[in-house]
């Protein structure tokens, strides 16, 4: 297997492929998540294998020392010097289960989950449908609303619709939501391209920026309130973990505030 490192262990240990990196805007946070997962899996039971997804979607078994790199670009530069490429059709021979540490598009939206199901490889986390619905903010809001849960007023814009009549749509949105309102891509995470809009002049630039990331954009009423995170483990008898509140440091909590040590605050 070349110079790529594996944790020496008896064959009875479960081989866990920790997939990190990826092709989304959140690949740096994925590196942080992958490091944490790799370090915290009990080595007496599991054999963690660091698997890096490069910017073109290829998979590589990387040396453990690569996990200490500061950025995914640093890892990608050295893939030909110590890492081993894993063809997707060979992945099942390398692992017993995949722990998905990918963030954002093609990692949390059901795409990678569906690929693993086609390859008949078990994985940790939500399935294809739940992942896809969770990433699509418009569909998630519709489902929550059907269950009687309050959601902010939302308008969805397609790129074709906006291109055909940006001025008319801007007037309609201002009449419907007023200011401030919030503009965001429909299928991005970690506050990517999320903008608080406080005036008519700010609306079109915010929408254009959101369209750089997705072909669908949401415009929502602005709601000031707490942001709470609560993880849930299991399906038949789900266990809700202790919730935490994210303490805001700005109007919009961005990726660094939510994930990077020392940048944000939770209680």
For each of these PLM feature ranges, what is it?
Residues 143-151, 209:
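Basic phosphate/pyrophosphate-binding loop/patch that engages nucleotide-derived ligands
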Residues 93, 149, 177:
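Structured loop/turn residues at beta-strand edges in well-structured enzyme cores
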Residues 195-267:
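Phosphate-binding site of ATP-dependent enzymes
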Residues 1-129, 133-139, 146, 157-171:
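ATP-binding N-terminal substructure of ATP-dependent carboxylate-amine bond-forming enzymes
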Residues 144-145, 173-192, 214-224:
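ATP-grasp fold ATP-binding core
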